[in-house]
């Protein structure tokens, strides 16, 4: 039956489709504590696993004594690498083409490495039994600094690779060398520098940090020895990839492997990889024939799961005396830890670091990245960014500030002078990226006008003129371009696995719908955002659209959620699947209204006959017809599947400004104002966008102002608890102001670019720029993170600015 004729605007509002500030559909159950996480899952006969970990960073295993643990009541098994060897599971491949030990075999490579597992009736017995397992070691020399690791006399860290002169990414120049990868035209860039009237250089270290999600990693593995089926509930950002890898490792057919990612308490890249704990729990379930749960504690999470950053970077810019950039040259030494486990594209072992030319029209550029083994935990994940983009943005933005300071130019002026102009898009960088769209000049002007930038500079000048001022004032300005939407399979496969994503939509006979995707939410608001896309495309109210993700037995194959790929890739798949349904629905509507398809117009939620608004059919009308009285020759039902492999990345951008006051007596830094303008293309739900931006800015503040993972010379991590590792609360978190421009992506079905990672990428160099700017009048060009009160106070003392 036809719905009553209503105003189109009212009907569009009722749909809660794209753009309204609709509340997140998933919020209610989380607010009420009704989420369902891995640690909430219980199964009959379930056992618990804990892990024996190495107390040293480098050493040979002489002997493992496990009899005392096995004698304890409630202990079912203690397994070591020797027990995994018959299953060929003591080593496993990494996503970077390396191999990593599941359980240490003969040698440990980093502190807290997995040495043995204990399976017991409960986690407390398992923990006690772990203490009862005694391991004898012969300690070996430890190498923590990747620069030292490349010295001729450095100890061999990966003896399993001894004698191998090439790796997955080319020649190995040293026994601790993984790869050297470069992009751009080196000869042409060197020639520019040789003749440039102005050059600047800067060394900077981007410290190792940890994503530190609220929920740690864990799984519940259940193998059915009768059916040969394996079901594993797991904290994974990419459940289908886990299914494929588990099948390859275990030999269990993929059709018999079910991976379920239930509610996940944050990922931020930390839950993309496959950790030894997952493999061990699966092995334990296969060996014992019972479900096995493993959930790591916070110390294990910070100490052993994938870190981010740890980049030693040297940047150079060549320019004219009036500030026009002529060339960029970058050399990096990247600490990959004990195993190369970075989830980077196979073609780009340094990730997408070559986005380091940023938002600027730079005629010549070259970058080189060297990956190195050390005695630290492996990782190098894309912590709330695309692969290595945070490091790239940090480098170019610091270098532009260094150049501005040398030329005595304003930081905003030099950026505007070198921006890629709107009419240059699509723009191909010297590194081969094709930026889809952008309008940097308009965005910069909007920010400078909104904050009254000249007034801030005037206040800063007055403050500097007063030698008795109790505070220093710094103004940081950053203009960044991100690359997201991993990503085109032709550019971005991981060991041959394409980076497409998928959607299946089914409209039920009564007009409600269910949609299943290959992504998995960890707080991004997928249930709301995805439903809004479908609501807009098909005219079905979002409240009757059910969104399901994370179960490989029902969801179409997809590559998961990371690198801001949900909306750019899965969102496109959703829109295109919906359009397949829309095309079929048009045929059915034409049949029902007895007109030609070309005689129909689509308006919000209905097809109507051109020139007669009283003749129309809604999607609910069409759905019933599709199932029960479809036109002759048309297959019954109303559903579609679409796999989307994007033709290009998407390139969101932003302009951020931060004003800080630094107490000259204590080094305490207070953020007076932070203004963040983001352009993520088409905006689907402003409320969710703002929430994601607030979260990214807060994590960026944590990284810039307090987070670090320092090691001593013996490889001990100094600060692997939340007593030491800075996570800001509401007390420390500054007030955020957000703004936007809209520059849709021309190749994306709905013009969306992605947003959740941009604020993290852009905010970190903005905080650093503000702190350094407070010292600029005494010639300081750079200060490494984190900008803790103590480190800032030391800089005040060093430059005779302390009171």
Swiss-Prot record:
Keyword Oxidoreductase belongs to the record: yes
Cofactor note: Binds 1 Cu(+) ion per subunit.
The reaction(s) this protein catalyses: CO + a quinone + H2O = a quinol + CO2
Organism: Hydrogenophaga pseudoflava (Pseudomonas carboxydoflava)
InterPro entries to which the protein is assigned, alphabetical: Ald_Oxase/Xan_DH_a/b, Ald_Oxase/Xan_DH_a/b_sf, Ald_Oxase/xanthine_DH-like, AldOxase/xan_DH_MoCoBD1, AldOxase/xan_DH_MoCoBD2, AldOxase/xan_DH_Mopterin-bd_sf, CO_Mo_DH_lsu
Database matches in SMART domains: Ald_Xan_dh_C
Keyword NADP: no
Described purpose of this protein according to its UniProt entry: Catalyzes the oxidation of carbon monoxide to carbon dioxide.
Residues involved in Cu(+) binding: 385
Keyword line: Copper, Hydroxylation, Metal-binding, Molybdenum, Oxidoreductase
EC number: 1.2.5.3
Binding, Mo-molybdopterin cytosine dinucleotide: 757
SUPFAM superfamilies noted in UniProt: CO dehydrogenase molybdoprotein N-domain-like (SSF54665), Molybdenum cofactor-binding domain (SSF56003)
Subunit structure: Dimer of heterotrimers. Each heterotrimer consists of a large, a medium and a small subunit.
Transmembrane spans: none
Pfam families, sorted: Ald_Xan_dh_C (PF01315), MoCoBD_1 (PF02738), MoCoBD_2 (PF20256)
Gene Ontology molecular-function annotations: anaerobic carbon-monoxide dehydrogenase activity; carbon-monoxide oxygenase activity; copper ion binding; iron ion binding; molybdenum ion binding
Essential cofactor(s): Cu(+); Mo-molybdopterin cytosine dinucleotide
Chain positions with 4-hydroxyarginine modification: 384
Record's protein name: Carbon monoxide dehydrogenase large chain
